[in-house]
């Protein structure tokens, strides 16, 4: 991946950080963002990737992120991983009827509009053979009690993926790594983010466009293709 430029939003923790590390280790030019400047600087120092403090709720931040990535690479971006997301509250303890308007609005602005913004701002720089990957999970498709706005936002983000997959030339897909131990899921007994990061590398490099465009790439799909 020495000649490829990869952008990862939400790259300072969890899956995002693991994906930044995986692509940097593969030789790609990786540009990532996060809200916390200190965390961005820490990940950049550890991985050798290029960190930008940016908030996906702000389209001007995202525009600057994509311009930085194009400038640092070969003028184009070959891969975008639209990973940034929030989950306000404790999973399983967020009855939707009790969700504050402010929490609903911020979750949707980050997890749905943030995906939209990331793809829109990437498009002027996205290579003709570029790809967009968006992490999601079964919570977007299978209702579970007390998951609050997070579940709704994930369903919304998948709808955004399907719309772009239909409308643009480059493939856009959902990557569902199953339950992963992150701050968003609130569990620490699931898969480690580092164990699922190779899914993203496979979807970016080995999977065919027909295999991924508008599709959900889950663990079964990945393991079947790589065993």
Q: For each of these PLM feature ranges, what is it?
A:
Residues 87-105, 146:
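Conserved mid-core segment of classical short-chain dehydrogenase/reductases
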């Amino acid at each position: 991946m020495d000649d490829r430029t990869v952008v990862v939003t939400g790259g300072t923790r969890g899956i995002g950080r693991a994906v930044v590390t995986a692509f940097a280790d593969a030789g790609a030019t990786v540009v990532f963002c996060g809200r916390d400047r200190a965390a961005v600087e820490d990940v950049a120092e550890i991985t050798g990737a290029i960190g930008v403090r940016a908030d996906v709720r702000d389209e001007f931040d995202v525009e600057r992120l994509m311009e930085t990535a194009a400038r640092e690479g070969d003028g184009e971006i070959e891969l975008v991983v639209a990973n940034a997301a929030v989950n306000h509250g404790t999973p399983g303890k967020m009855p939707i009827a009790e969700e504050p308007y402010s929490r609903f609005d911020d979750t949707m602005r980050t997890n749905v509009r943030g995906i939209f913004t990331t793809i829109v701002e990437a498009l002027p720089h996205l290579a003709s053979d570029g790809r967009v990957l968006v992490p999601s999970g079964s919570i977007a498709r299978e209702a579970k009690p007390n998951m609050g706005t997070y579940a709704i936002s994930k369903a919304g983000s998948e709808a955004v993926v399907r719309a772009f997959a239909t409308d643009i030339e480059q493939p856009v897909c959902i990557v569902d790594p199953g339950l992963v131990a992150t701050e968003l899921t609130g569990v620490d007994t699931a898969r480690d983010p580092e164990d699922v990061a190779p899914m993203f590398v496979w979807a970016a490099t080995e999977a065919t466009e027909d295999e991924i465009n508008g599709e959900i790439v889950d663990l079964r799909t990945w393991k079947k293709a790589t065993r």
